[in-house]
Amino acid sequence: MNLKIKYYLELIRVKNCLTASFGTIIGGLIASNFNFGLIGYILLASLIVFLVCGFGNALNDIQDIEIDKINKPNRPLPSNKISLKSATIFSYLLMISGIIISLFNMICFAIALINSIVLYLYAKKYKRNKIIGNLIVAYLTGSIFIFGGASVGNVEITLILFLCALFATWSREIIKDYEDLDGDKSEGVISLPIKYGKNSIFVAIGFLLCSILLSPLPYILGMFGAPYLMAIMICNVLFILAVLKLLKNPSKEIAGSSSKYIKIIMNLVLLSFVIGSLM
């Protein structure tokens, strides 16, 4: 592979972009009940997400170039593998390309535009304010599913998935901040755990409970049948076990393991939505 291409892929954190694209594909397939006749629109949506996500990741590296000279000197920018000017032009080309392609669907266009603005604000203003930053990360994580649904003209079911993902991600980000409390303090970061200590764990648990309470809605509203309900209830039991573990021992070590545990369960929740759309 051409070294320059490799460095640009590293700049945009290509694995993160592919993960976001995959989430968009899953969202589109769920919303279309796995109608592969609409796969062209879904793949187009996943490309847009890849481009906009790449813009956000590149912009973060541009903002962090001075810090990365110390902490991550081998990244493309601090190591001068890519110039700051080239990285800036490249990042905005990604964003503009994504927004132009999104014009095939006006809801997709609106989301792509809003998310690009949110990513810009996150990189420029809120990255070190995790109280707001965590909400932004949670929103962006959930929005990929709505984007997939919008590409096939059905956002209803993905709206519930969006809310479940938003609250679960928000919860997990706060728990991660609790684990990283000492490091964040030394770097002057603002976070709920820094402001409220162990009480922030109760906020995280509250958000996780919101996700649990919303999860049966597809069954209650008649969107999905019993197989979905059975699958999501298993996920909810696992979530509750994570909550009980945190309540019993809200230590940084338990927070670290709970964060990883919650991430696994979130993937199982996504699988439950897939089961619901297929059965």
Swiss-Prot record:
GO terms for biological process: glycerophospholipid biosynthetic process. It is found in: Cell membrane. It is a multi-pass membrane protein. Its EC number is 2.5.1.42. Its cofactor is Mg(2+). The chain crosses the membrane at residues 14-34, 36-56, 94-114, 131-153, 157-175, 201-221, 224-244, 259-279. Keywords: Cell membrane, Lipid biosynthesis, Lipid metabolism, Magnesium, Membrane, Phospholipid biosynthesis, Phospholipid metabolism, Transferase, Transmembrane, Transmembrane helix. It is an enzyme of class 2 (transferase). It catalyses: sn-3-O-(geranylgeranyl)glycerol 1-phosphate + (2E,6E,10E)-geranylgeranyl diphosphate = 2,3-bis-O-(geranylgeranyl)-sn-glycerol 1-phosphate + diphosphate. GO terms for cellular component: plasma membrane. GO terms for molecular function: geranylgeranylglycerol-phosphate geranylgeranyltransferase activity; magnesium ion binding. Pathway: Membrane lipid metabolism; glycerophospholipid metabolism. Prenyltransferase that catalyzes the transfer of the geranylgeranyl moiety of geranylgeranyl diphosphate (GGPP) to the C2 hydroxyl of (S)-3-O-geranylgeranylglyceryl phosphate (GGGP). This reaction is the second ether-bond-formation step in the biosynthesis of archaeal membrane lipids. This is Digeranylgeranylglyceryl phosphate synthase. It comes from Methanococcus aeolicus (strain ATCC BAA-1280 / DSM 17508 / OCM 812 / Nankai-3). The lineage of its organism: Archaea, Methanobacteriati, Methanobacteriota, Methanomada group, Methanococci.
